Design a protein with these regions (language model features):
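Sequence signature of WD/YWTD-type beta-propeller architectures
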Residues: 1-103, 246
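A generic structural motif
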Residues: 10, 125, 193-197
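PDZ/PDZ-like domain segments forming the peptide/carboxylate-binding groove
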Residues: 115-174, 244-245
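PDZ/PDZ-like groove recognition
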Residues: 49-72, 123-143, 234
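Solvent-exposed, polar/charged alpha-helical surfaces in well-ordered, non-transmembrane soluble domains
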Residues: 26, 42-46, 50, 67, ...
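Extended, small/polar residue-biased N-terminal targeting/export presequences
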Residues: 78-133, 200-203, 208-223
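Cleft-lining beta-strand/loop regions that shape enzyme active-site pockets
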Residues: 38, 53-55, 61, 144-150, ...
Length: 328
């Protein structure tokens, strides 16, 4: 029996507590095992084949000769030299079914979190012996606490053109990259030595573990500017990243501004899927029934609120998956 991290041997015919002699704890630290990777990879390949055959939604595997597919790919397992190669083979094998929601999810890829490099939310120029120039500090999105560059924190305020000279007193250059200097710094305070023009100063920052939210909002802002420029300000833009709570929140974060225009470009490219597409369709299908006018309004407001004032176009690509594919 396993409970959390403890493995025990207990009777199956009656209940025992932890102090009962019949409750025997197994010390896993004393176990030793020898793994032959190639044997393990063969087992993983064969098990994947059995699982797909057992759980596939159609007994005839949608017309695919599954056993022939396995025979075709199985010899490749004897030619690989890493588990990453095996994952590639499994992806190719499952891909022969041409079926959505058929994934290969590798295990144990998180690594040691204490060694994770910190990120500063900026783009950099070519490093020199004088340091690493900041080409651009990513603006971020003030309404999302996860989408804010550490370099824009209070008391830091680094700008485009500043040069990071050192991290925790360790000088950057050809012998020490910024990435190396920030290794293991995610979520903890580090000191940057920065040159702004002719002035040197030291600032304390807390690097991020993940820039994805920051980069996402920056990308959305760039697409919004593109649509505004190309349409002469007539079209609004919004992006829905997935069909779960995050995407639902993003829709409402962006819809107020988007629906102030004559039409809307609704972007679901790279949508991760989920289950809220029907809600999204209902929300974007809201029709104008009336108008609210106010003395200080720069434009009349729709009734119901945030209804699309004109045509709506949906943009998608091959990376919109599941519910994100259905909606488009």
């Amino acid at each position: 029996m396993r409970h959390k991290d403890e493995v025990s041997v207990v009777p199956s015919d009656h209940k025992v507590d932890a102090e009962d002699p019949a409750h025997v704890a197994v010390d896993l630290t004393r176990l030793r095992r020898r793994i032959t990777p190639r044997d393990e990879w063969r087992q993983m390949f064969d098990e994947n084949g059995r699982l797909m055959a057992t759980h596939y939604w159609r007994d005839d595997m949608n017309g695919v000769d599954w056993e022939a597919v396995l025979r075709r790919y199985r010899p490749l397992v004897d030619r690989i030299h890493s588990v990453d190669d095996l994952y590639d083979i499994l992806w190719e094998t499952v891909g022969e079914l041409n079926t959505s929601h058929s994934y290969v999810s590798p295990a144990g890829l998180d690594g040691d979190p204490s060694l994770r490099a910190g990120l500063l939310g900026a783009d950099y120029g070519v490093p020199t012996d004088d340091g690493v120039p900041i080409v651009r500090v990513v603006p971020g999105e003030s309404s999302d606490p996860l989408a804010w560059s550490p370099l824009r924190a209070a008391g830091v305020a680094l700008r485009d053109g500043d040069v990071i000279v050192a991290v925790d007193g360790n000088k950057l250059g050809h012998d020490l990259s910024l990435g190396e200097a920030l290794e293991g710094s995610a979520g903890r305070t580090v000191e940057l030595t920065v040159r702004t023009g002719d002035q040197m100063r030291r600032v304390a920052v807390v690097p991020m573990a993940d820039e994805a939210p920051l980069r996402y909002h920056d990308w959305v802002a760039s697409r919004r500017r593109y649509v505004e420029e190309r349409s002469g300000g007539r079209l609004g833009y919004l992006h829905v990243p997935d069909m779960v709570s995050n995407g639902w929140a993003e829709l409402h974060r962006q819809i107020v501004e988007a629906t102030r225009h004559e039409g809307v470009v609704a972007d679901v490219r790279f949508n991760h899927g989920g289950h809220t597409s029907q809600l999204v369709v209902e929300r974007l299908s809201r029709q104008v029934l009336g108008w609210d006018f106010g003395k200080w309004y720069d434009t009349p407001a729709t009734y119901p609120q945030n209804a699309v004032r004109g045509p709506i176009v949906m943009v998608t690509n091959q990376w919109a998956g599941s519910d994100g594919d259905i909606v488009s």
